[in-house]
Amino acid sequence: MSYQQPQLSGPLQRETDSSDRESLISGHEHGGKSSQSAAVFNVVNSVIGSGIIGLPYSMKQAGFPLGILLLFLVSYITDFSLVLLIKGGALSGTDSYQSLVNKTFGFPGYLLLSTLQFMYPFIAMISYNIITGDTLSKVFQRLPGVDPGGWFISRHFIIVVSTVTCTLPLSLYRDIAKLGKISFISTILTTVILGIVMTRAISLGPNIPKTDNAWVFAKPNAIQAIGVMSFAFICHHNCFLVYGSLEEPTVAKWRRIIHTSILVSVFICVLFATCGYFTFTGFTQGDLFENYCRSDDLVTFGRFCYGITVILTYPIECFVTREVIANVFFGGTLSSVFHTVLAVLIVTAATLVSLMIECLGIVLELNGVLCAAPLIFIIPSACYLKLSEEPRTHSDKIMACVMFPVGAVVMVVGFVMAITNPQDCTHGQEMFYCFPENVSFTNTSWSHLQLTT
């Protein structure tokens, strides 16, 4: 987009409430064309994207009561850091995350941010391939006359075919605007999926035994759970685009938009995480759809919707990775031939890695702790602390001082725990409660089931 952030009059040494109400792009006479409601929709869609499928798993990792508290905490920090980024842009006179970090920490900071902004969507592409293979393989198994054990409906074959026929061609577009309708379609499909998860929480949940520690307050893997939540909530890479698209954008207006967006998003996320975890408790997988029985046609439809959602979202992530490489190494300009070659190389690399990984949970954890956590917790707070001349007792500075070490702990400890204490998954296996002899589990203890299944 052509919007430019002008230099502000004065260094903004004191960001008071009155200055927050002033336009931060006063040099841009007309601003963008997006309404506040459209901006809210864009932010909500960014948050409740494909990462929402792992939120019930994060409840299993952290313990349900602590997991809900952590979900609210991550949402609050996301809210705060999104506002902090725009304030940092105002202080530095920049209009993008990259230019903000470059202005604040120079070229080394720019390279670090670029690395994170490449890694996050690239690992997301890997997770999308895993989800596509897991979900669509079970969809095709329900088709009449299809051999459930056939190689042509195996997850590996489906990943390769969906890549060649769908995600790669879509990833070759040079203009991301051509993918503009994807966000609306994805939001509709995500709403359908939420409805299915809620329905099965009521109809299926009471028939599945609860594990012994299902309602324990906290579990040792809470740090990894924060990583999964961070993966779901991150939308910082496009906040400057949304802000710049507003008519007469101001910090006060942006703050209202973010508060509304995060409030809606956290309501949906808590509902999804609660319904998913209540249904399966300690059996919850990183990919929630792995928990449902293959014979459940309603869930099969949900799998189809989710598979389509991630296929449509995949090209956007590829666009980001390609743009990062183009900006860092080629000055932002690629020839048509090299654009195609680079897209093919990125998609091929993501596909090869996804074929070697079975469990979605570890991918969500690593992407959350290695990429999402620094992009949400560390970098926004570091930029603001260096740029702002507010007193140390100012509430924003206090919060930024808390966010920075918390993000560092989540990143380091979460990575170590994800590697040294990986969680098992039952990829490709039918869960025990799906077999005919276990049709009803009401008033049945889990310890008894362990002896009989």
UniProtKB/Swiss-Prot annotation:
Record's subcellular location: Membrane
GO BP terms: amino acid transport; sodium ion transport
Principal subcellular localisation of the protein: membrane
Keywords: Amino-acid transport, Glycoprotein, Ion transport, Membrane, Sodium, Sodium transport, Transmembrane, Transmembrane helix, Transport
Membrane-spanning intervals of the chain: 39-59, 66-86, 106-126, 150-170, 179-199, 222-242, 262-282, 299-319, 337-357, 359-379, 398-418
GO cellular component: membrane
Keyword set includes Nucleotide-binding: no
Composition bias type Polar residues, residue spans: 1-10
Glycoprotein among keywords: yes
Composition-biased stretches (Basic and acidic residues): 14-32
Region called Disordered, residue ranges: 1-34
Positions bearing carbohydrate: 438, 443
Membrane topology designation: Multi-pass membrane protein
InterPro entries from the UniProt entry: AA_transpt_TM (IPR013057)
Family: Belongs to the amino acid/polyamine transporter 2 family.
Role, per record: Putative sodium-dependent amino acid/proton antiporter.
Protein name as annotated: Putative sodium-coupled neutral amino acid transporter 11
Native organism: Mus musculus (Mouse)
